[in-house]
Amino acid sequence: MTFRKYFDCYDFYDRAKVGEKCTLDDWDLMKIPMKAMELKQKYGLDFKGEFIPTDKDMMEKLFKAGFEMLLECGIYCTDTHRIVKYTEDEIWDAINNVQKEFVLGTGRDAVNVRKRSVGDKAKPIVQGGPTGSPISEDVFMPVHMSYALEKEVDTIVNGVMTTVRGKAPIPKSPYEVLAAKTETRLIKNACAMAGRPGMGVOGPETSLSAQGNISADCAGGMTCTDSHEVSQLCELKIDLDAISVIAHYTANSDIIMDEQMPIFGGYAGGIEETTIVDVATHINAVLMSSASWHLDGPVHIRWGSTNTRETLMIAGWACATISEFTDILSGNQYYPCAGPCTEMCLLEASAQSITDTASGREILSGVASAKGVVTDKTTGMEARMMGEVARATAGVEISEVNVILDKLVALYEKNYASAPAGKTFQECYDVKTVTPTDEYMQVYDGARKKLEDLGLVF
């Protein structure tokens, strides 16, 4: 049976007003974990410790489980406390009509984002930047310039301005609007100073309200060739502010980057259960948000990292499955435990770059060092490693990738609780010349040597 019209954010808003009532606790503590557990058992999902899947039948079962999760659960609206349900036809229509490619940036700095596959020989797009990490106002430009100066980096992902004109960008205040506009203006100036004025950016990151996000589209700020962020909530939830942002993005013909970080050990539960939710979230991105691409980021509930053994498995299986059975374009964001200028930070980022590249990700986004929560602890050097490792991994046999990852993760996974704090950007770089210190170069070379010993060929 055909459907009356294509589903969009306006339909979502209308259904969020009349859908089935549900409490937040019932959603988080009953509906999500129970359905994920039920689907894991129904499809007999067992990843058997693999980072990147080699069992196509198991991948197909995972896709069916993720599809069913979205169909049967729907999406919870936190403002109306109602559930928005989709029909099976609406879900398939979104999957079958995704944006298959797009261009980020302009001129000679523009990059084409196209579908990759598991084991693809092409290097993914590297979106380098603080990835939502807090950055001091006085070094905001040089921090982002450190990424634009890296040739491995194709586009920039914004950091968060801790202040603007010395004031906190409080949500729904004039300072939030000013920060949302200033954030991208400063970054684009930094790119121009690095000789790459046409680089695309991804944001805004500072603003937390719809008015802030919408105001970032402005003269000298974000344009339709930049990635415009809207975030789903964990797990399979959204608020109406985000729906309003989507309405603006679609009406403005913006590239839409739908973001969400499924939590391993959280509401969904274990590895397979969280991956089911991750697949459902990917599909919801193109249905609810009309997303050009989905920015993933499975994160460990205890360690706050995306680079653990468990979260890498979730990321690898989710992306490989989405890549195998859909044309949805997918990225992943990086949150190591360790801080900059440490070998552990670089090895953590490398493990995720290997996983993402081999599993078919189109975009790698990072690195938010020190879990992305410490001011000024992120630099362009971590993105250089992310890019170099991606280049070295592209085209490597999946069986070999799984062996390398097992050995690599073992090098740092016992050190999460005592992860080295690392150094700030100001300690890692000459701020005036925006060049890394000799110390960081030596640390970088040491990490690179360990990766070569594991079998990567740079």
Curated annotation (Swiss-Prot):
Pathway: One-carbon metabolism; methanogenesis from methylamine. Its EC number is 2.1.1.248. Gene3D superfamilies: Monomethylamine methyltransferase MtmB. It catalyses: Co(I)-[methylamine-specific corrinoid protein] + methylamine + H(+) = methyl-Co(III)-[methylamine-specific corrinoid protein] + NH4(+). Can form a complex with MtmC (MtmC1 or MtmC2). Catalyzes the transfer of the methyl group from monomethylamine to the corrinoid cofactor of MtmC (MtmC1 or MtmC2). This is Monomethylamine methyltransferase MtmB2. It comes from Methanosarcina barkeri. The lineage of its organism: Archaea, Methanobacteriati, Methanobacteriota, Stenosarchaea group, Methanomicrobia. The gene is mtmB2.
